[in-house]
Amino acid sequence: MTQRTLGGTVRKRKRTSGFRARMKTKNGRRVIQARRSRGRVRLAV
């Protein structure tokens, strides 16, 4: 039986690259700003 190895956890993903995590730092805000200017539908994970 095969094993699922690379699942990824939602909590970790949200905490590191979620919207609120991005807004906490200056560079994170730059990321959001850049994605807004490019017209991205999804700004953060």
Curated annotation (Swiss-Prot):
Lineage, uppermost ranks: Bacteria, Bacillati, Cyanobacteriota, Cyanophyceae, Gomontiellales
Protein name per Swiss-Prot or TrEMBL: Large ribosomal subunit protein bL34
HAMAP family membership: Ribosomal_bL34
The keyword Nucleotide-binding is annotated on this UniProt entry: no
Superkingdom: Bacteria
Keywords associated with the record: Ribonucleoprotein, Ribosomal protein
Gene3D superfamilies documented for this protein: 1.10.287.3980
InterPro entries: Ribosomal_bL34, Ribosomal_bL34_CS
UniProt family annotation: Belongs to the bacterial ribosomal protein bL34 family.
Region feature Disordered, mapped onto this chain: 23-45
GO molecular-function terms, A-Z: structural constituent of ribosome
An annotated GO BP: translation
Cellular-component GO terms for this entry: ribonucleoprotein complex; ribosome
Keyword Ribosomal protein in annotation: yes
NCBIfam families from the UniProt entry: rpmH_bact
